[in-house]
Amino acid sequence: MAMLDPETLRTFVSVAETGSFSRAAEKLYKTTATISYRIKLLEDNTGVALFSRTTRSVLLTPAGMHLLAQAREWLGWIDSMPGELQQINDGVERQVNIVVNNLMYDPQAIARLLAWLTQRYPFTQFHFSRQIYMGVWDTLLHDDFSLAIGVTGTEPLAENMAVYPLGEVTWLFVMSPHHPLSQQTDPLSEAQLRRYPAVNIEDSARRLTKRVAWRLPGQKEIVVPDIETKVAAHLAGVGIGFLPEPLCLPLIAQGKLIADTFRPCVPLRH
């Protein structure tokens, strides 16, 4: 409709934001008479008063406040549309969903990645999900995600996907220096280990077979939801188990954890 053309809406928003016809005129490089005429025409066409005028100020009416919110949204959409259309023409997706392995999820790293992505692709919406073990594959295969960081294994689980190596995770068997096993002489036997619970993270897969974490036959297991809780449980001495080397080396250096030479029969890989 002509009464809601972009030029009229920008005039209305300027008057609302400055609270003055004359200041809006200066901002838009128009005469005060032009601004006043546009607002009067807009009010006549809508059939409602958008401003309450006094000798000192111009205030929005309830209808004016509603139009202001809508006008800002419309103008934002109009201003961004050329860039959005160009991005679509270049083959850039409007929505990109990325799933990240719990072991590799770092809030600061994700924030830096988002800063780069949003600058490079300003009109794309990004959705990040944090999953555990086979939950990464599960999300990638079944939940409309197009990229995964840190999938398990070296082969894709679908023909239309490609896997690129990031490296292997080295695991260390650790415990609190206050844990009873810390006083035992290396190497620890399975019989000694079985007396204390293993702390493991629950696999978040819902449709794929869950990964079996390290636990000896007959050993009690404590299951936690994420790597942060697993680390905290080790620090508190409530259980034993494996942690990624880069994560636990600083804690070992600080004397908060100790590493044992125990190695499982089947090497841990991730």
From Swiss-Prot:
It comes from the Bacteria. GO terms for molecular function: DNA binding; DNA-binding transcription factor activity. The keyword Transferase does not apply. Residues 4-61 form the HTH lysR-type domain. PROSITE patterns: HTH_LYSR. Residues 21-40 bind DNA. Keywords: Activator, DNA-binding, Transcription, Transcription regulation. Belongs to the LysR transcriptional regulatory family. Positive regulator essential for the expression of allD operon. Binds to the allD promoter. This is HTH-type transcriptional activator AllS. It comes from Klebsiella pneumoniae. The gene is allS.
